[in-house]
From Swiss-Prot:
Protein name according to UniProt: Transmembrane protein 115 homolog
Cell compartments where the protein resides: Golgi apparatus membrane
Entry annotated with the keyword Transmembrane helix: yes
A Pfam family recorded for this sequence: DUF1751
GO BP, sorted A to Z: retrograde vesicle-mediated transport, Golgi to endoplasmic reticulum
Family membership: Belongs to the TMEM115 family.
Originating organism: Saccharomyces cerevisiae (strain ATCC 204508 / S288c) (Baker's yeast)
Note: Present with 1630 molecules/cell in log phase SD medium.
Glycosylation sites: N114
PANTHER family noted in UniProt: PLACENTAL PROTEIN 6, TRANSMEMBRANE PROTEIN 115
Length: 342
């Protein structure tokens, strides 16, 4: 789909908008999301209508259903909320965004992965494990700060809103979404590779300035790092799009690729150049501790990185060059120009 005006150009790949047949996992997750979100709305509205008669000043936002919503103080009585909260939302804007994300983005992702199992794992399993970690962090921080309230529900459904942009960046790295034409000083191509940090920046600023809900801020960033970590190190996919690639793992006689070892999918490249010098030593330290020292995660071999780079380049990602490689390329260009024009 393309749209052009004097102010901007909008370009979305046709494959991204192909929803003629919604894949099985995406269909199941979408239907479950609609049903549970509608159920939660009915439960809260019914409770509110009863309680408001006793207290006319009752705030509707304080009405909760701990069976579905992830309330830290009630989690021991209702552990089902760790899973069910992946399928609910209470804010209208988030319902609309997540439905579009699921129907359009989920269909695109599942077709590219060619695996309903991986879609279920990413949304439900990873989402639930992330919720467990978020609850643990929230309870821990509550011992040191009275600003963290344990009676307010945490949003357990950030995997779609935050995780999907990471996948879009992985599958469509250099594809331009919007090209601003005017004003000239703002003229810029907004590509899918910028979408994750744009979403994270927007949601972080919103929580800090307007909502002041710091437990939700934990949830946002934990979901971001958990989603990236799974895609980077643990996801298992058959290399259907690149059948000629060598693979180093097999499962049930089928060759598989584990994770995304490409240079462009390194965590540091998700962040702006301005803060990379600050973040690089921090990320390197964490990598050395987790991977090199304690071997919690299996490190990538050279062949894994080569395969990852080949797949990333086939998707349109630009090759990451070191300073030495850039200097060598520049020197070759200068030499060629001198040979052509002595």
């Amino acid at each position: 789909m393309q749209y052009s005006s004097r102010f901007l150009e909008l370009n979305i790949p046709d494959s991204f908008l192909n929803i003629n047949k919604i894949p099985d996992a995406t269909k199941f997750i979408t239907v479950t999301y609609i049903c549970l979100t509608a159920t939660l709305f009915c439960i809260r509205r019914s409770l509110y209508n009863k309680l408001v008669l006793e207290d006319p000043n009752l705030d509707y936002n304080l009405i909760t259903s701990p069976l579905l919503q992830m309330v830290p103080s009630q989690i021991w009585r209702y552990p089902t909320s760790l899973v069910l909260s992946n399928f609910i939302d209470t804010k209208a804007w988030k319902v609309v965004v997540n439905l579009l994300n699921l129907i359009i983005g989920g269909s695109f992702i599942e077709r590219n992965w060619n695996s309903s199992k991986e879609m279920f794992k990413f949304i439900i399993v990873l989402g639930s494990l992330t919720n467990v970690l978020i609850i643990m962090l929230t309870l821990l921080v509550s011992f040191f700060s009275n600003k963290v309230r344990l009676d307010i529900p945490l949003d357990g459904n950030y995997t779609i809103l935050i995780g999907f942009p990471i996948i879009y960046r992985q599958l469509l790295p250099e594809t331009t979404i919007i090209h601003l034409k005017t004003p000239q000083f703002l003229a810029k191509n907004f590509r899918f590779k910028l979408l994750p940090i744009f979403v994270m920046f927007t949601m972080t600023v919103t929580q800090i300035i307007w909502f002041h809900h710091f437990a939700q801020l934990f949830s946002i960033w934990v979901t971001f790092f958990a989603s990236w970590s799974y895609l980077r190190f643990f996801q298992k996919l058959a290399p259907l799009n690149c059948p000629s690639l060598p693979t180093t793992n097999s499962q049930g006689g089928q060759e598989i690729l584990v994770g995304d070892a490409s240079d462009t999918f390194q965590l540091i490249y998700f962040f702006p150049d301005l803060i990379k010098p600050i973040l690089r030593p921090i990320f390197n330290f964490i990598y050395n501790v987790v991977v090199v020292k304690f071997k919690v995660i299996k490190p990538f071999h050279d062949i894994d990185i080569d395969i990852g780079n080949t797949i990333a380049e086939s998707r349109g990602a630009k090759k990451i060059m070191t300073v030495e490689e850039r200097r060598r390329q520049l020197a070759l260009q200068v030499l060629e120009e001198r040979m052509v024009n002595p």
